[in-house]
Amino acid sequence: MPKQITGETTARLKHQDVPEAEMSVRALLQAGLTRAKDSADWSSISAATRVVLPAADGPMREVITGRSIRPTGSYASRKAGRPLAFESMNERAVFVHSEVDTRVANYLSQPCRFEFVLDGVRRSYVPDCARILSDGTLEILEVKGDRRDLDDVDYRRKLDHVAQACRVVGWSFRVVFGAPLRARTIRNATVQLIQHHRLAQYGAKDVFVVHDRLAAAASPLPLGELARALGNEVVQTAAARRGNA
């Protein structure tokens, strides 16, 4: 049975009547652990592995302490409905792209903690981010600058253990490299411009216009055409820049 700990007590999943893509990250983490309790594969590693969840919806820990020499900050996410702390510009880049990526329904920084024994040594690992995709898949992400950050063999073995635990529970685990997301490209510039207006206000009429145009279209519509339907010059500018790529 998976060792699932919320705060100092074991949590039990309440019945969910909402689609997985609409659940909170913590609720979906909890659901996966509950489903895994009858898995023979999980029982083979659960004796030395447990997943600790935060006591409430939100990050496992706040990373901004004022003592770190690394660039830290907070990203105000409309999609997550809360500010998300980051420990590097690579993590921030993942947040920015997650905010714009329509495949991402929700996401959260520092979502849980894995505790396990590897080679007789107690280990602890906190993922950089967890994302819920539109199809209900839960992704656990480790964010690195590039492949050179994985040169340490012991660290790779640590990630391999976490990846194995995720597969057994039914989560996806992958390493995301931030360097390509921060490169000076037209695509990244467009993502930056769009996310810059992520907190813009819109009403039911705007949503209706977009749904109406998409439903009537025989193929995917360019962003610029939707922007013209809304009369939004800022988004039109973003579309024009993207079109000149």
Where are these regions (language model features)?
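Electrostatic, structured charged patches in enzyme active sites and in nucleic-acid/phosphate-binding
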Residues: 1-245
